[in-house]
């Protein structure tokens, strides 16, 4: 009887010890966020990045159609994207308060204000540092969910609940701690949509690393769109008017060649 009690006690102690060791080895949210910030260049470098211009191409329909692409960000929360083909330019912009678009490929050549649901993705694009940096100040909550396989990589998985209730699952590379995938669940026009974005080929813009390969689309959809960035520029001069709803179209300043 005593032997059985001793064996049970030892077994329980081993289980507790193993659980404690596992808990101890699990990184915390703060540790992962700190490593993510450091991987991007550090807090000082991020603060020093006032504007960011990305130039390249947008591939759609499995790469059969190629558009010229440009995105420009300005702190604190302004963004504008342009995609051009055959003399027509699709524009989407957000000035920190409202979003608007020009959709010539759909026969709509005049600027139109975007609905609160339609502008959600653009608001996320306006976050130059991503959802993890300063997450508390943004009103987000972040939870560590362990590791999950991302195309053969055991990535750290973080759940980010935004202030508006939308959820993003952020996957960090276990060695470099940069984002390699973001799965966002948002309510749009009364229905939930899941958008999966894969990020890679990080390059420096000034002193900050940014992804230059971006593939995105609805989760499970094989026909995803891909952005390939050929040029990254940090702290370029930008006028605020390009983000505001215009009475007429204002083109982006072109990158220097």
Question: Where are these predicted regions, by residue range?
Answer:
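Bacterial N-terminal signal peptides
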Residues: 6-18
């Amino acid at each position: 009887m005593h032997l059985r009690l001793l064996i049970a006690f030892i077994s329980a102690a081993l289980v507790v010890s193993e659980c404690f060791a596992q808990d101890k080895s699990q990184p915390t949210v703060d540790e992962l966020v700190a490593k993510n910030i450091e991987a991007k260049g550090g807090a000082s470098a991020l603060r020093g990045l006032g504007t960011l211009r990305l130039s390249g191409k947008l591939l759609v329909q499995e790469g059969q159609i190629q558009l010229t692409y440009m995105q420009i960000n300005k702190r604190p929360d302004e963004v504008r994207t342009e995609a051009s083909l055959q003399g027509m330019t699709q524009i989407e912009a957000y000035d920190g308060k409202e979003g608007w678009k020009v959709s010539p490929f759909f026969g709509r050549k005049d600027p139109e204000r975007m609905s609160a649901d339609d502008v959600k993705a653009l608001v996320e694009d306006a976050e130059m540092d991503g959802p993890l940096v300063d997450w508390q100040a943004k009103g987000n909550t972040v939870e560590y969910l362990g590791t999950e396989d991302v195309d053969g990589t055991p990535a750290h998985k973080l759940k980010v609940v935004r202030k508006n209730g939308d959820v993003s699952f952020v996957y960090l590379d276990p060695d470099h701690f940069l984002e390699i995938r973001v799965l966002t669940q948002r309510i749009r026009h009364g229905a939930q949509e899941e958008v999966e974005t894969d990020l890679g080929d990080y390059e420096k813009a000034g002193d900050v690393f940014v992804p230059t390969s971006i593939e995105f689309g609805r989760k499970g959809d094989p026909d995803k769109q891909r952005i390939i960035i050929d040029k990254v520029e940090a702290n370029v001069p930008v006028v605020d008017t390009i983000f505001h709803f215009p009475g007429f179209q204002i083109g982006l300043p072109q990158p220097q060649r």
